[in-house]
Amino acid sequence: MKLFLALVFPSVFRCETRSIYVHAHTYEYTVHTQVPEGVTVSVEHRVVTVKGPRGELVRDFKHVRAEIEVVKDSEGKTKVTCQLWHAKSKQRSALRTVLSHIDNMITGVTKGFRYKMRFVYAHFPVNANIPKEADRIEIRNFLGEKRVRHVPMQPGCKIIRDNTVKDQIIIEGNSIENVSRSCAEIRGSCLVRKKDIRKFLDGIYVSEKGVIETEM
């Protein structure tokens, strides 16, 4: 029997009783998050769908070797659980990342995400034109250039001009990935090239990140 255990579980067999308990304790790794009222979460083949007052978000987690389920606890509250077997350190980190994505999806369909960006310039004022559809922005006169920069927003995002603060725009949406990617594309369209960036600080930068205060 000892020979069989040594061949099948060599690392466990050589450990002390306390180490065997730790190994058995980490045999199954489970994390969970609560689902608030008014939000519906469904899972099908590791494709998570979250529905809330602001809309619906869908994300595919098939690349993660995990069991994602929607269950109810002893108090009758709904929660999403993510479970892994024989999980190592990196796999446990990936599982917590999946749960963070689901939390962001729940926040997106209940509150929404809002990023604010400011225009920074020294000599040439940056002019921005936002159409009524609020699905793109046209940037003009950056560093005095005549070229017009057209930046479309990601799906589900809208851009508006902040009338309370000068040279500030607001990007809103339910998906934090799409909102942040829209800001990154605006920032990337106004990069200073072939100049000393320590001296030429012109550009459009993210000044504030958060959620939409007025819930729908």
Where are each of the predicted segments found?
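Ribosome-associated RNA-binding proteins
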Residues: 2-216
